[in-house]
Amino acid sequence: MVRVKPFAAIRPPKDIVTEVAAPPYDVLNSAEAREMAGEKSLLHITKPEIDFEPMLEDHDPLVYAKAVENFKAWQAKGWLKRDVKECYYVYAQTMEGRTQYGLVLCAHTDDYATGKIKKHELTRKDKEDDRMVHVRIQNANIEPVFFAYKDNDILNKIVAQTVTREPEYNFIDENNFGHKFWVIDDDKTIDQITRLFCGDVDAFYVADGHHRTAAAARVGAEKRSLNPNHTGDEEYNFFMAVCFPESQLKILDYNRVVKDLNGLSSEEFLAALKKDFTVKEMGAEIYHPDHLHNFSMYLDGKWYSLEALPGRYDDKDPIGVLDVTILSNLVLDAILGIKDLRTDKRIDFVGGIRGLGELSRRVDSGEMKVAFALYPVSMKQLIDIADTGNIMPPKTTWFEPKLRSGLFIHSLD
């Protein structure tokens, strides 16, 4: 079973929470962050390059030092304050009428090492290294990771009872997403939550934050090696996560746009597709794929339905049966010559939150030649793949809404 604990969050007073809270560091580029960040915004801590001229490189030592300086300053000014008691917290997010309720807690780095925290994506060492530097220099998890767990009726009841109270925070963000936050500070409920996770929940599933999770585990191992009196209970062994029951989560589509047809004409490309797909022209109106193995394609001002032909993919392989794998193998690799989704500059990825209109816009602008929309992966598929130790192809899952940063921070002290 997993190991969790409460923690004393460092967080903003309720009257300035909207001024401090910000989108995650990887949602905005530096220019967007400069434009959005107010005086108290956490972006000065998560994207400290915005406090310098744009020509300074994001990973310059001055940038990292500025992050530390700002974190200390925010606490000194009272814009971030540490709770006096270790608590659990409930964080609710509402998007388009659907609400998901997460428990904010600390997970143990050992569970990542032993596979109880299950991943579905590979990480890149350079991104891990960057996140590791941030955790190390701040001695804190500034932003949480996003976990799922299999539903537990008693935990669901505790959360349901908690959210009948007036929330500590309650606001709408710039995307019209709702955010609410409650503190669980009574000892009986805290003990009950700890016992339920440690006794009944056998795994966490990383939904979003693979690099932050890996970085937290590496920092924990580093601090462990430097402590001759290490016990495993020190705060550095734990990192901050928001954990949602899997039934409440919805994965959005994660789509692809490609710059060229690898030397083919549109007619030759369509002919090549027909070897592995039933291709049907759908006209100028946006076409959404509505079931597994059905794809939407936008080319030369027209939408097409692509239906993968039986026998052209391995329906016995949990990875081979994924639509991202089918598209990668039969189209992106075999026809368009894109071998590595992580490094090929001819392909880009568009999260489903932007809508399929973003795909046609990028093609019509001339920036891209063709776009593909996929039917979303299900939480069951994600969990089944993680449970079998398999890894999904890059850019398979898009979770929305993203966790808001600045509502809670975990100190490793």
Model-flagged regions — what are they?
Residues 1-413:
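Surface-exposed, charge/polar-rich loops and edge strands
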